[in-house]
A protein has these predicted regions:
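Structural motif
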Residues: 3, 63-66, 259-261, 316
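Hydrophobic anchor at the start of a short beta-strand
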Residues: 4, 35-37, 127-129, 260, ...
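N-terminal [4Fe-4S]-dependent radical SAM core
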Residues: 4-5, 11, 162-213
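A general structural detector for well-ordered alpha-helical segments in enzyme core domains, enriched
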Residues: 25, 53, 112-120, 244-247, ...
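Radical SAM [4Fe-4S] cluster-binding motif and immediate context
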Residues: 186-317
Length: 317
């Protein structure tokens, strides 16, 4: 049985792409000695399948079952929910998407959400039910939730489970945990971080995985609500070159992965970043393909970005 089980959704029912947040948190927790099962593709999990997984994975040692809300439906101010969002093409133009049933994400925005929490507690009443992800703030008031993590949670989840497991002194936790929502404690350094997938994730060579090169953006745009903007020193928010190389090589050697979506807020926010990624790509024994967010207006004033993007392997923006 696992210490912690994390459920992650997918951007779109037709893409079969995994969200990366649950795997980033899972990697961090494993590095601190916890056994973690990450379950992907929640769009294809209903309450019956969820119950099967819980029966197989939850035991007396299980500290928590968590859910990533990033690709869950939007909860609207009037209490209703919407699945029709631009990030989910299969649902964007499908009016029937509002009535999709029998899936974990849709049930989370409906009247049957407590069935999932009740199932967890029927196996182990002491197991905590937690939420994280980009839409966690929308789901704070769900009945049956023990704790909600807001923001980048690497440091907070480790402190939380260290307290629950007895590794550190017991703490009284607020329902909303956001004391280090930018993950900036001195004890942790994003630049050394990676995502390491387990064999039980069954990564296929044809998959497109998600990749962080940097966390944050050097610009401070008025319209942007992302938390880590306005960073002037690129050395503070870019992964170390060797760390990025090792992550790409691990996925290539273990799974044959060569396609990635780069999830940086603005991939071309500096020439230095592109040059660093090109150095990494030049060392690889394979030719990767990347998708990313680029600002075209920056390219106009930095024409060298065109050739750098081509050399790196940017296929689509």
């Amino acid at each position: 049985m696992y210490d912690i089980i994390l459920f992650g959704d997918m951007p779109d029912r037709n893409t079969y792409s995994r969200a990366s947040g649950s795997h980033r948190i899972g990697t961090e927790l494993r590095e601190h000695g916890y056994s973690v099962l990450v379950v992907d593709f929640s769009n294809y999990i209903n309450i019956d399948k969820f119950s099967e997984i819980i029966d197989l994975a939850v035991g007396e040692n299980t500290l928590g079952v968590g859910f990533s809300t990033t690709w869950f439906p939007f909860l609207l101010p009037d209490g209703s929910a919407s699945n029709r969002e631009p990030s989910k093409p299969a649902m964007r133009f499908n009016k029937a998407a509002e009535n999709l049933s029998e899936s974990l994400p849709v049930d989370f925005a409906g009247p049957h959400v407590e069935d999932y929490f009740d199932k967890v507690r029927s196996v182990n009443p002491k197991t905590k039910v937690i939420l994280g992800g980009a839409k966690a703030f929308m789901y704070i008031n769900l009945p049956g939730i023990d704790n909600v993590f807001i923001g980048h949670a690497e440091t907070m989840v480790v402190e939380y489970f260290d307290s629950l497991s007895g590794k550190t002194s017991n703490r009284i936790w607020n329902k909303i945990i956001d004391h280090d929502k930018k993950a900036q404690r001195p004890s942790w350094d994003f630049r050394k971080s990676n995502i390491s997938y387990e064999d039980e994730s069954f990564i296929l060579p044809s998959e497109t995985l998600l990749l962080e090169v940097g966390r944050g953006c050097r610009f401070n745009c008025k319209f942007c609500s992302f938390p880590l903007i306005g960073q002037k020193n690129i050395g503070d928010y870019l992964k170390f070159e060797e760390c990025l190389y090792n992550e790409l090589m691990e996925n290539w050697n273990r799974f044959g992965t060569w396609k990635y979506t780069i999830v940086d807020d603005t991939f071309n926010d500096s020439t230095e970043k592109l040059e660093m990624v090109k150095r990494v790509v030049d060392r690889l024994p394979f030719k990767p393909a990347f998708w990313c967010y680029l600002r075209l207006d920056i390219i106009v004033n930095n024409r060298e970005h065109i050739q750098l993007a081509k050399d790196i392997g940017i296929r689509e923006v």
